[in-house]
């Protein structure tokens, strides 16, 4: 689909009245650009599961801690070859398949030493178009270190194979949980904690990584959950380094997923961290309502979730907005704050959106209020 068509659809997601006040279809992803590369390497593996306890805004003690991120060729290697990968994935058996996306398919794999990892394999039929995405994900993942971001463990680039090896996150995607495909439905407290985790991960990318990173594809299917229902942001194929000069934006081709795309970015081709903030606002509405950004099977006045949510928010019908699968009562003051923050993040112009650090702080304050309300 051409870019103008995406622009029309995504602009339709924004209610014009936003400016006056600060389970349906699958995700459609914009095409990738081309690039070339030729190297083989892998990174050291380590423990991949860790329970993240609830805490205030979890930030690195100092940005300087990450100022000397090691280059790929300096990180301890596990020297995985294709025969080892084939054994670990049972020759890429469908029984090991745990996910699919724009880059390719993801498999659960057990290494010879017993470690369980995830191996993402590029689609061969789209190999040329996916080379840029592969390089971007490897290079950017190698520079980050945060509990709420999926950790890169290794990669293989040999012949016609492109593999990315990451930590294994066993809980599946957030979207699967919202669709009710898992054993238990997420309760409100879990959804609030997941929102905070994602905000922390994005804040790290924007402010505390060695260089500013803009994710560009924040969505529910790119949020992985641990067994204890803590969130990790995944899939950095569309990620882009922010500008390290005095500029306020990066001019670049539009990439991302329909329904989550910043309308100002689509109009001007100017990418900023506030583009991730917009996507997070859409995600937060998704977490609270259970609805996808666009649901064509619903009635006309409910197909675009942002429009529907804004109308309900102005009417003060917060409980009607809450995902009915939760089947629980939540203090309306808490819901008003949560939905209000989501709508503010999804403002049509970046100047009206908070930054991710502020979003995380507001969510933490909402969490404190929620815990107090539960004790009453």
Please report, for each region that a protein language model flagged, where it lies by residue.
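Single-pass alpha-helical transmembrane segments
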Residues: 1-14
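Membrane-proximal cytoplasmic juxtamembrane segment of single-pass cell-surface glycoproteins
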Residues: 14-37
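Conserved eukaryotic protein kinase-like
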Residues: 37-376
């Amino acid at each position: 689909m051409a870019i103008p068509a995406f622009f029309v659809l995504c602009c339709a997601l924004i209610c014009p009245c936003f400016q006056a006040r600060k389970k349906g279809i699958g995700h459609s992803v914009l095409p990738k650009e081309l690039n070339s590369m030729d190297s083989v390497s892998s990174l050291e593996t380590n423990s991949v599961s860790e329970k993240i306890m609830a805490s205030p805004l979890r930030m690195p003690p100092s940005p300087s801690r990450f100022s000397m991120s090691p280059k790929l060729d300096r990180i301890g290697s596990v020297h995985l070859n294709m025969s080892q990968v084939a054994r670990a994935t049972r020759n890429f058996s469908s029984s090991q398949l745990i996910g699919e996306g724009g880059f390719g398919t993801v498999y659960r794999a057990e290494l010879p030493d017993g470690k369980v990892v995830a191996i993402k394999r590029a689609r061969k039929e789209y190999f040329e178009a996916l080379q840029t995405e592969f390089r971007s994900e490897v290079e950017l993942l190698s520079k980050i270190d945060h509990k709420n971001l999926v950790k890169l463990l290794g990669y293989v680039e040999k012949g016609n194979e492109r593999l990315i090896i990451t930590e294994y996150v066993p809980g599946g995607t957030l979207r699967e949980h919202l669709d009710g495909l898992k054993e238990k439905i997420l309760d409100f407290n879990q959804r609030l904690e997941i929102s905070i985790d994602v905000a922390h991960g994005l804040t790290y990318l924007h402010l505390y990584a060695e260089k500013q990173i803009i994710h560009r594809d924040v969505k529910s299917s790119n949020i992985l959950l641990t067994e204890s229902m803590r969130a990790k942001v995944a899939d950095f194929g569309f990620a882009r380094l922010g500008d390290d000069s005095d500029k306020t934006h990066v001019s670049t081709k539009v990439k991302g997923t329909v329904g989550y795309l910043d309308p100002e970015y689509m109009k001007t081709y100017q990418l900023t961290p506030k583009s991730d903030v917009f996507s997070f606002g859409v995600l937060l509405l998704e977490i609270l309502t259970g609805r996808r950004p666009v649901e064509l099977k619903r009635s006309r006045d409910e197909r675009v979730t942002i429009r529907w949510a804004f109308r309900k928010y102005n009417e003060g019908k917060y409980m009607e907005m809450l995902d009915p699968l939760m089947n629980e009562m939540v203090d309306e003051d808490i819901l008003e704050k949560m939905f209000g923050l989501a709508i503010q993040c999804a403002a049509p112009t970046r100047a009206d959106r908070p930054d991710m650090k502020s979003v995380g702080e507001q969510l933490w304050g909402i969490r404190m209020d929620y815990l107090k309300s539960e004790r009453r």
